[in-house]
């Protein structure tokens, strides 16, 4: 028996402007040249990466970059460390720089702090592409932590400058700042969180509350997806995380449910539309 679900897609979900810019740039060159190298996944969404690979996108890692000569290589929205630009120059590689302007601004601020001999802490995910690029601005001397508990084991300087990965939670950032000040440190905090991402937290919570159930669509590698899914769960306990329509579990829905679909800033709208069609077919 058909479940007769009413399904809406959150109009504010989908790619942020930084990702749109990188993908538009890639598609333009793929159309002209038929292929393009990209340093790391262009976006943390396997389905979108597969779509672009089919058009000729070739994903390489940093270890493969020194072996390339006289090629075009796309730098994705996450940005890159100075070392990448140095290798490109040596190997006559044309960099198609699609670094997000918000990330570039943050890189410049961190570089300025480092040049002024400030001690730098970065609230961010270990090993994340953006964070690696940020650390590169400090000759990898900045201390990265993703949870304040990590700092319990570290001897911190009496004063330091605190930065954040652009997709982190604003509330968590300020809670960390307040806690560090409470512990007696002199903290110069730079709120460098992208407002297109942070504004989604509030809007997404309001969206999730309107529905019986929420289906959140995101790549499993997306940091932003993890944070936004937590927002959904907080607003609506019946929120379900999937990466593609094949992961839909029909048993969690009941007849005439009102379903809201939303996603990360790395989730393509076409994928959310496929999920909508799959839910409406149940």
PLM features per residue range, with description:
Residues 1-282:
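The feature marks the mature, well-folded catalytic cores of soluble enzymes
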């Amino acid at each position: 028996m058909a479940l007769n679900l009413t399904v809406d897609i959150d109009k504010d979900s989908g790619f942020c402007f930084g990702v749109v810019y990188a993908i538009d740039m890639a598609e333009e060159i793929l159309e002209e040249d038929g292929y393009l190298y990209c340093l790391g996944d262009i976006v943390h969404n396997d389905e979108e990466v597969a779509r672009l690979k089919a058009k000729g996108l070739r994903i390489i890692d940093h270890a493969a970059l020194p072996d390339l000569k006289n090629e075009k290589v796309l730098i994705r929205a996450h940005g890159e460390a100075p070392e990448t630009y140095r290798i490109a120059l040596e190997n006559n590689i044309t960099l198609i720089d699609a670094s997000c302007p918000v990330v570039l601004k943050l890189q410049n601020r961190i570089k300025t702090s480092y040049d002024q001999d400030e001690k730098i802490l970065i609230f961010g995910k270990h090993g994340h592409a953006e964070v690696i690029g940020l650390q590169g601005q400090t000759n990898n001397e900045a201390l990265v932590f993703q949870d304040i508990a990590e700092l319990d084991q570290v001897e911190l300087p009496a004063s330091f400058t605190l930065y954040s990965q652009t997709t982190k939670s604003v509330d968590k950032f300020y809670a960390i700042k307040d806690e560090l000040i409470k512990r007696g440190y002199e903290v110069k905090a730079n709120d460098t969180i992208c407002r297109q991402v942070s504004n989604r937290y509030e809007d997404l919570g309001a969206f999730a509350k309107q529905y019986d159930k929420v289906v959140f669509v995101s790549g499993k590698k997306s940091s932003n997806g993890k944070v936004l899914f937590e927002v959904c769960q907080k607003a609506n306990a019946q929120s379900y995380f999937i990466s593609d329509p094949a992961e839909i579990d029909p048993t969690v829905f009941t007849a005439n449910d009102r379903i809201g679909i939303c996603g990360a800033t790395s989730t393509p709208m076409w994928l959310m539309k496929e999920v909508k069609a799959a839910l409406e077919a149940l």
